[in-house]
From Swiss-Prot:
NCBIfam families hit by this protein: PS_II_CP47
Gene3D superfamilies the UniProt entry points to: Photosystem II CP47 reaction center protein
Subunit and partners: PSII is composed of 1 copy each of membrane proteins PsbA, PsbB, PsbC, PsbD, PsbE, PsbF, PsbH, PsbI, PsbJ, PsbK, PsbL, PsbM, PsbT, PsbX, PsbY, PsbZ, Psb30/Ycf12, at least 3 peripheral proteins of the oxygen-evolving complex and a large number of cofactors. It forms dimeric complexes.
Protein's name according to its UniProt entry: Photosystem II CP47 reaction center protein
Biological processes per GO annotation: photosynthetic electron transport in photosystem II
HAMAP family (UniProt xref): PSII_PsbB_CP47 (MF_01495)
Co-factor binding details: Binds multiple chlorophylls. PSII binds additional chlorophylls, carotenoids and specific lipids.
Gene expressing this chain: psbB
């Protein structure tokens, strides 16, 4: 046929059977990828430390999505929460992966069948005997079925009425587990961080979809609208479908990057804004202040800070710290976190407590500056010793650790103090194993960053695809030179402009 690569899809333009076939094959590829990727991730995933080496630090991409829908156990005998399990059954990570691969195989066979048996009676118009699809009716059927699935997910799966529920956690990502969720029908249901909104919105949207589907099945579009929106043209379907997909892609890119109840930090890692706003740091200080108010010692209050909470307050877990072309998981960057060293408290020789100014997200290097409680600079690590007034040596800065592995240990040696001051720029200080994975020490992004980048990029691409195909279908007559209302038989090649009798070719 000799079609250029960008026009090959014209082979299914007026062939409903093979159009169905290629879509089934596409579903086979998507489901096959999902199942295969899940098996690969399960092969390389280490579930031994859910606190310091969670799935998002290891670069898992599909495991978090399975987990948020209620899958927590593996045939390997482990649970995502760190415990063990004996009989996970079919609804395990491997079971879901296998189901996707089996479904992919069935779709593959169905695609071949529909490619071979493309000329089915169901695709033919009874009046003309030519292949034809009743697109408004198909739209109604699909809308109805999508509404049923949406309603079922919200009313049964999420609520736990017939299903496991979804992953729900506290605002600081410490107590997450799979549980049933009651729908939130009040104004709180519109809060993107309230899990009840997921149930209520799916129930509401599903109900609307069912009603809209029944409407489109029972009411035919007016002729003017049918012609104006080219409802008989399959490219109209392509254009509007692309619109639905790019809109959804933009929405999920936003909910992933900015965070929501659908993207828990235990599964996808914290957001960059939690570092920017000192979100976890504030909670840690709140707990410390509450402990001190109860006359507990600094050592006691810092020892009660959960290691998980301290680990979130570390810049290496900020998804915006990854760079372009830095492939690999976070563990391949700064290493595998082994343990929390504790919270360093710096003091000058006057006994003032000093705080290290933290590195902003988009800096690779940042001056080491120590300020007092009033924000006045008291010490730094100078760039030029000759100009220094506030160097660690001159000011006599010491550091003492509270909580963690170095609890109660103090240092006054300037070299050691400066080392920990530099590390305190990056948040809480952790011991990191860079040898095991040959980690290069350069920060990587988390799956939160990859998902956002991928979906935002494809959404932009699909936006242009929507404009392109929408324009093609709306202005097809202009582009082709054929009046869509032309009833006369047109002889191709008789006119210089197709269908225009004033441009009849003259025999030479």
């Amino acid at each position: 046929m000799g079609l250029p690569w960008y026009r090959v899809h014209t082979v299914v333009l007026n062939d409903p059977g093979r159009l169905l076939s290629v879509h089934i094959m596409h579903t086979a590829l998507v489901a096959g990828w999902a199942g295969s990727m899940a098996l690969y991730e399960l092969a390389v995933f280490d579930p031994s430390d859910p606190v310091l080496d969670p799935m998002w630090r290891q670069g898992m991409f599909v495991i978090p999505f399975m987990t948020r829908l209620g899958i927590t156990n593996s045939w390997g005998g482990w649970s995502i929460t760190g415990g063990t399990t004996t009989n996970p059954g079919i609804w395990s990570y491997e079971g879901v992966a296998g189901a996707h691969i089996m479904f992919s195989g069935l779709c593959f066979l169905a695609a071949i069948w529909h490619w071979v048996y493309w000329d089915l009676e169901i695709f033919c118009d009874e009046r003309t005997g030519k292949p034809s699809l009743d697109l408004p009716k198909i739209f109604g059927i699909h809308l109805f079925l999508a509404g049923v699935a949406c309603f079922g997910f919200g009313a049964f799966h999420v609520t736990g009425l017939y299903g496991p529920g979804i992953w729900v956690s506290d605002p600081y990502g410490l107590t997450g587990k799979v549980q049933s969720v009651n729908p939130s029908w009040g104004v709180e249901g519109f809060d993107p961080f309230v899990p009840g909104g997921i149930a209520s919105h799916h129930i509401a949207a599903g109900t609307l979809g069912i009603l809209a589907g029944l409407f489109h099945l029972s009411v035919r579009p007016p002729q003017r609208l049918y012609k104006g929106l080219r409802m008989g043209n399959i490219e109209t379907v392509l254009s509007s479908s692309i619109a639905a997909v790019f809109f959804a892609a933009f929405v999920v890119a936003g909910t992933m990057w900015y965070g929501s109840a659908t993207t828990p930090i235990e599964l996808f890692g914290p957001t960059r804004y939690q570092w920017d706003q000192g979100y976890f740091q504030q909670e840690i200080y709140r707990r410390v202040s509450a402990g001190l108010a109860e006359n507990q010692s600094l050592s006691e209050v810092w020892s009660k800070i959960p290691e998980k909470l301290a680990f979130y307050d570390y810049i290496g877990n900020n998804p915006a710290k990854g760079g372009l072309f830095r492939a690999g998981s976070m563990d391949n960057g700064d290493g595998i976190a082994v343990g929390w060293l504790g919270h360093p408290i710096f003091r000058d020789k006057e006994g003032r407590e000093l705080f290290v100014r933290r590195m902003p997200t988009f800096f690779e290097t940042f001056p080491v500056v120590l300020v007092d409680g009033d924000g006045i600079v008291r010490a730094d690590v100078p760039f030029r010793r000759a100009e220094s007034k506030y160097s660690v040596e001159q000011v006599g800065v010491t550091v003492e650790f509270y909580g963690g592995e170095l609890n109660g240990v103090s240092y006054s040696d300037p070299v050691t103090v400066k080392k920990y001051a530099r590390r305190a720029q990056l948040g809480e200080i952790f011991e990191l194993d860079r040898a095991t994975l040959k980690s290069d020490g350069v920060f990587r992004s988390s799956p939160r960053g990859w998902f956002t980048f991928g979906h935002a990029s494809f959404a932009l691409l699909f936006f242009f695809g929507h404009i392109w195909h929408g324009a093609r279908t709306l202005f097809r007559d202009v582009f082709a030179g054929i009046d869509p209302d032309l009833d006369a038989q047109v002889e191709f090649g008789a006119f210089q402009k197709l269908g225009d009798p004033t441009t009849r070719r003259q025999a030479v």
